[in-house]
Amino acid sequence: FFGSVLKLIPKIL
C-alpha cells in the first residue's frame, strides 16, 4: 500500500 502511495506522491507534487 505505502509503496504505491510513495510512487503517487511525485505525481501529486
Swiss-Prot record:
Expressed by the skin glands. GO terms for cellular component: extracellular region. It comes from the Eukaryota. One of its GO terms (biological process) is defense response to bacterium. The modification Leucine amide is found at residue 13. Has antibacterial activity against the Gram-positive bacterium S.aureus ATCC 25923 and the Gram-negative bacterium E.coli ATCC 25726. Belongs to the frog skin active peptide (FSAP) family. Temporin subfamily. This is Temporin-PTa. It comes from Pulchrana picturata.
